[in-house]
Amino acid sequence: MLLPWLNEELIEAGCDEAGRGCLAGAVYAAAVILPKDFENELLNDSKQLSEKQRYALREVIERDAVAWAVGIVSPEEIDKINILNASFLAMHRAVDRLKTRPQHLLIDGNRFKKYPDIPHTTVIKGDGKYLSIAAASILAKTYRDDYMNKLHQEFPCYDWEHNKGYPTKKHRAAIAGHGTTPYHRMTFNLLGDGQLELFSK
């Protein structure tokens, strides 16, 4: 079972991101404040759940959470500030949108850029340790998946419906054959074979 909180006395928000390693699309983050007595045996790291389970849990989280929000950073912004800073910014934007102000942030990972006036704790593999981070992981992933599925309708040859923008062979072959889209992150090694510089000339 995942832990319900780090500090029972504080209003805690769990934060996580999705899409950091993708070649295309925005990075998404979510922040979730759960009730102190929240329990759900299925809730776990979103990567270990089926797609059907993630979407079912999203409904539960949105219904039962004290507050939840999603933050988005565009591919253009990612290229300007780099993906690490973009991940932090997406989490900041999610926290900005929470209707209840948290007193403490639980961050998945080992690094974070401090949010103004709210202390934080980073937790390595936190989505497998704390309920609120696991909940944030599910919201970030499912909302980003919805977004990539919509982009797939516009550019079906990149197979975003299945790869969600991650660097699969089919995705990279489509980039080599069809070029890039406005949704590709141009500062990333899109072809993965050292040929990006030649490709972009």
UniProtKB/Swiss-Prot annotation:
Q: What is its main location?
A: cytoplasm
Q: Where is the RNase H type-2 domain?
A: 10-200
Q: What is the protein's name according to its record?
A: Ribonuclease HII
Instruction: Tell me yes or no: is Repeat among this UniProt entry's keywords.
Output: no
What gene is it encoded by?
rnhB
Query: What subcellular locations does the record give?
Result: Cytoplasm
* Keyword Transferase included in the entry's annotation: no
InterPro entries assigned: RNase_HII, RNase_HII/HIII, RNase_HII/HIII_dom, RNaseH-like_sf, RNaseH_sf
Listed under GO cellular component are: cytoplasm; ribonuclease H2 complex
Pfam families with a match to the protein in the record: RNase_HII
Q: What class of enzyme is it?
A: hydrolase
